[in-house]
Design a protein with these regions (language model features):
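A short, glycine/Asx- and small/polar-enriched loop/turn
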Residues: 54, 71-75
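Conserved catalytic cores of phosphodiester-cleaving nucleases, focusing on short active-site segments
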Residues: 34, 79-95, 106
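Nucleic-acid nuclease catalytic cores
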Residues: 90-137
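A short acidic/basic microdomain associated with nuclease active sites
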Residues: 53-66
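Solvent-exposed, charged helical/coil patches
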Residues: 1-56, 125, 131-137
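Well-ordered beta-strand positions
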Residues: 58, 78-80, 119
């Protein structure tokens, strides 16, 4: 039963295995620390957790933002995992639509297909898997 469920998940979502590992790391961080800390504390703890799970990443990865082919600024991604997935962390009471829209805009700006929006600030870990519009799930 588990194998067929995993197959369905893998067929339905691109990079589901890697996003699942990242979410698992986030769950462990939230289990140990709970909510109530600043975002940077969760960033540091998640870096430790991903190192232990041998997940490669760059942290505070600066990326250029382009408009009509011209660079108009930069933005730092909390984590850029294995060159495939953007991970944006929050430490707020609850995620709102504006945070989801922001994550989707980052995917567009960085020409990336998949991202995770993670919130450590709620009593239970909140996470949203985001995909650039037009990517088939």
């Amino acid at each position: 039963m588990i194998e067929s469920l995993n197959t369905m998940i893998n067929e339905k979502y691109p990079q589901s295995e890697l996003t699942g590992k990242i979410i698992g790391c986030c769950m462990e961080v939230h289990r140990i620390l709970g909510n109530g800390f600043q975002e940077v504390i969760y960033q540091r703890a998640l870096a430790i957790e991903m190192n232990q799970k041998q997940i490669s990443y760059s942290r505070e990865h600066e990326m250029a933002i382009f408009y009509k082919g011209q660079e108009i600024g930069t933005r730092r991604v909390d984590f850029f995992v294995e060159g495939k997935i953007m991970v944006e962390l929050k430490a707020i009471i609850c995620l709102e639509d504006v945070h989801l829209a922001q994550a989707i805009n980052y995917l567009e700006a960085y020409s990336m297909d998949i991202g995770l929006l993670i919130n450590f600030g709620a009593r239970s870990l909140e996470f949203k898997r985001v995909m650039k519009p037009g990517i088939k799930s």
